[in-house]
Amino acid sequence: MVTRMATKVSLEGKRVVLVPYMAEHVPKYHQWMQDSALLEATGSEPLSLEQEYEMQLSWTQDPNKRTFIVLDKDFVKGDLAHGQPHVEAMTGDVNIYMNDVDDPKVAEVEIMIAEPRSRGKGLGKESVLIMMAYGVKNLEIHKFTAKIGESNTASLSLFRKLGFEESSYSGIFKEVTLEYPVTNLRREELLKLLDEVIRHTHSSNNPSDSLLSGEATA
């Protein structure tokens, strides 16, 4: 059986580039995950490097998940050809999960800006918006959710500024769930955002990855 990666496109915005999570990224990602503050903020458990490689492989092969590494364009060296990991510019990751058993068009969004040098520059906001636009255009997502620990005030502030509203709270997990229904107006705004996103790709057997505007083939 041939295994297909779920994501075969890189998305270039004004300040960030979203690239598929590659094996070359794993050592740096593993280094981030040694930070107890990041583990708490993301609700993650520490993994060994070997487990991190296994996780990377499972994420990239999961048809119900899209995972991108966030690159800070200020630190990218060389060309932005698709397939180049640009580890030197890694700053975080952004994901969407289609894990609602009752509605496959609902997606949970996660964002992490791990590098202190890249915080406070609006990279998290731009990454989330590009990911949401990607989800609406490619995957026909009609509602986004975000689950955020109550102590993660930065993420709560970001998602609320984007228009997410609280839908529930878990006292056991001390976690807030926020929702963002994709109304017609919001869909138009997200799709308009794609006009400014450059898509870097190579040939893919996944039709849903060929629907973005501004293509640059590499």
UniProtKB/Swiss-Prot annotation:
Expressed throughout the plant. Keywords: Acyltransferase, Cytoplasm, Nucleus, Transferase. One of its GO terms (cellular component) is nucleus. It is found in: Cytoplasm; Nucleus. Residues 36-183 form the N-acetyltransferase domain. Its EC number is 2.3.1.48. GO terms for molecular function: N-acetyltransferase activity. It catalyses: an N-terminal L-alpha-aminoacyl-[protein] + acetyl-CoA = N-terminal N(alpha)-acetyl-L-alpha-aminoacyl-[protein] + CoA + H(+); L-lysyl-[protein] + acetyl-CoA = N(6)-acetyl-L-lysyl-[protein] + CoA + H(+). It is an enzyme of class 2 (transferase). Acetyl-CoA binds at M112, I113, A114, G120, K121, G122, L123, G124, K125, N152, T153, A154, F159. The keyword Cytoplasm applies. The keyword Flavoprotein does not apply. It comes from the Eukaryota. Belongs to the acetyltransferase family. GNAT subfamily. Probable protein acetyltransferase with dual specificity triggering both N-alpha-acetylation (NTA) and epsilon-lysine acetylation (KA). Oligomer. This is GCN5-related N-acetyltransferase 9. It comes from Arabidopsis thaliana.
